[in-house]
A protein has these predicted regions:
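Acidic, Ser/Thr/Pro-rich intrinsically disordered transcriptional activation regions
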Residues: 1-58, 71, 75-77
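Central/C-terminal regulatory/activation regions of fungal transcription factors
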Residues: 4-12, 105, 111-310, 325-336
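Helix-boundary capping/turn motifs
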Residues: 16, 33-43, 61-66, 87-93, ...
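Fungal-biased detection of long, low-complexity, Ser/Thr-
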Residues: 18-27, 56, 60, 68-82, ...
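Hydrophobic/aromatic-rich effector regions of fungal transcription factors
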Residues: 28, 42-55, 66-117, 126-134, ...
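Glycine- and acidic
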Residues: 51-54, 216-217, 319-320
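Residue-level recognition of alpha-helical structural elements
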Residues: 58, 84, 117, 217-220, ...
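Acidic, Ser/Thr-rich low-complexity linear motifs
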Residues: 102-107, 140-144, 350-352, 399-401
């Protein structure tokens, strides 16, 4: 099975990107001349094939290639000059991928207590983020450098969201060329891990506020609230622009469509990203699901913060009321959208890539429905059913188990 999905060659990349993972072809070419990259690539390929086909021999072989690549990458990172080479960054990105492809058994008698899949994954992501920072902006302006930068961008943002704190990547203040709607989305969402950490620290400090500090604390809370609302409005504008691009492409293809059908929040088949997310290639589909996931996390955190800040103000400044959060800022709709399209990740032609692209949105939606007490809901069940029997779904299921998301299914 191919790792990358079968892309429509007619796509021009203006919406979501021509390739779902443009760094993969560059790494394949690099592997022709670099042994360490080749070892890392073989480790990923054998791990994926081994677990999908239940072939233990391939899995063991994959672990050997992984160990070789890991050792050589570690050696290269000790050299200030060698560490900056594209091949080292490529190896680091493949090691991140391997942690999603490997499968640590959940059986008590076979589980290695020294291994923690999510910790290993986060460690590789964090290290790769620091390497991006060390290499500097100029090394990511070449074609391969840009592809490698793109390859670590989403895992870095996901790691920041999952830990609710910034990492070396999300703290970068680089102005790289903005190529498409996916690039613009990631630029908008990049500050959110820092904002989530600020939310958490604000609430943590609430219990230690003295009488002479309440005004300063409230002012800081209002600043955070306004920052979050600004990002929300920017995300809404991004969605409207993406829908407009979809309409323009449909019109240029000769289809008669009413532009009013592409207005946010009204009824209609193609009035939202849900209606068009499967019409413009796998890259655009993945971008939409990542967008919903980020909105679900940001909107839910914002509403909780708004409630806590208002409660604090009621105690210290009775009568003062915060501005209302817009009705469309709700975590419910993004989670519902993910649930309704989750099966498309395992559609024919999606490749093994889909099992990895699905983990962040599906795990977040599963967690959301479990948290809100709806494990028996159709949305929850539809997501779990799509990867129970699929070969690529097996890898996604195992990684979900490894990061502790699957517990609601087994309780």
């Amino acid at each position: 099975m191919n790792y990358l999905p079968q892309e429509d060659r007619s796509l021009d990349g203006s919406i979501g990107g021509i390739l779902s993972a443009p760094w993969i072809p560059g790494i394949r070419k690099l592997a022709d001349t670099d042994k360490d990259v080749k070892n890392a690539l073989q480790a990923c390929a054998l791990a994926g094939l081994g677990w999908m086909n239940n072939d233990r021999t391939l899995v063991v072989r994959a672990a050997w290639f992984y160990a070789q690549a890991l050792r050589q990458t570690y050696i290269a990172l000790q050299d200030p000059v060698a560490a900056l080479d594209d091949s080292v960054l490529a190896c680091c990105r493949l090691l991140v991928l391997f942690e999603m492809l490997q499968r640590i058994s959940s059986e008590p008698n076979t589980t290695d207590p020294r291994r923690n899949q999510i910790a290993d994954w986060q460690m590789h992501v964090e290290g790769t983020c620091r390497l991006i920072q060390l290499r500097g902006r100029e090394r990511h302006l070449t074609s391969l450098g840009m592809d490698l930068y793109d390859g670590i961008r989403l895992p870095a943002i996901i790691q920041g969201f999952s830990k609710r704190q910034p990492n070396a990547f999300t703290q970068l203040d680089w102005k790289l060329p903005s190529l498409n709607m996916r690039d613009r989305l990631y630029q908008l969402i990049n500050p959110v891990p820092q904002l989530l950490q600020d939310f958490d620290l604000f609430l943590e400090h609430e219990t230690r506020i003295h009488d002479d500090m309440e005004s300063q604390h409230i002012a800081h809370g209002l600043t955070l609230l306004n920052t979050a609302l600004s990002i929300c409005y920017s995300l809404q504008a991004w969605e409207a622009e993406a829908l407009n691009l979809c309409y323009e492409k449909q019109s240029s293809a000769g289809n008669d469509a009413n532009p009013s059908n592409f207005v946010l929040g009204t009824a209609g088949e193609h009035n939202s990203l849900y209606g068009v997310c499967r019409l413009h290639g796998h890259g655009f589909f993945s971008t939409c699901t990542q967008y919903w996931t980020m909105c679900n996390i940001l909107y839910g955190s914002l509403l909780a913060f708004h409630l806590q800040l208002q409660t604090f103000m009621n105690s210290w400044t009775p009568g003062e009321v915060l501005p209302l959060v817009p009705e469309w800022v709700t975590p419910e709709l993004p989670a519902q959208n993910i649930a309704r399209v989750a099966g498309h990740f395992l559609a024919p032609g999606m490749g093994l890539w889909a099992a990895h692209a699905a983990v962040f949105p599906v795990s977040n939606a599963l967690w959301y429905f479990a948290k809100t007490g709806r494990r028996d809901s159709p949305a929850f069940k539809s997501m779990t059913e799509v990867f129970i029997t699929s070969k690529t779904g097996v890898i996604m299921r195992d990684f979900l188990k490894a990061i502790g998301v699957m517990w609601p299914l087994e309780s």
